[in-house]
Amino acid sequence: CIPIDPFYLTYKARSVDYHTRLIELAGEINDYMPEYVTARLQDLLNDERKPLKGSKVILLGIAYKGDIDDIRQSPALKVWDQLEAKGADVTYFDPYCRSVKRNDKIYESCTLGEDLLKNADAVVVTCAHTKGVDYNLVLEASPLILDTKNVISKVTDVDLKSCPKLHLL
């Protein structure tokens, strides 16, 4: 796994006076991605004349990677924190993570339905689950989608050029 295992390699390499700068740079880029996702979403909302503050944002998938329930080291949680810090109203849907404890509070995965999606200002795909998510419904009902995993175009028949509400990272 990119975020963790290579740093062990870096640690061991240093013990024999070998430097792994490329791995360290990749780690820095990975660490910055939640900030980039937040800024990108803010720009997309601004294009729709909506501020991030007060916007209803659904995080689609909060697990560390697709089709698991492990949230440890999940970048989605960092995105969640940054969105909330900027005043967004954040909810999440994850078919594998039905509830999560964060900051001494229990959060429940919402039910992914047409009304929820239509009433959101944006959906951010932060995990590429292949089961348990109706991506066609997400595509049809959401007003704005930021797909950080490029999963929607892989599992639907969407033509990216003719779908202005779908944005890839």
Across the structure, where does each feature detected by a protein language model lie?
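Structural/interface elements that position substrates and couple domains in central-metabolism enzymes
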Residues: 1-169
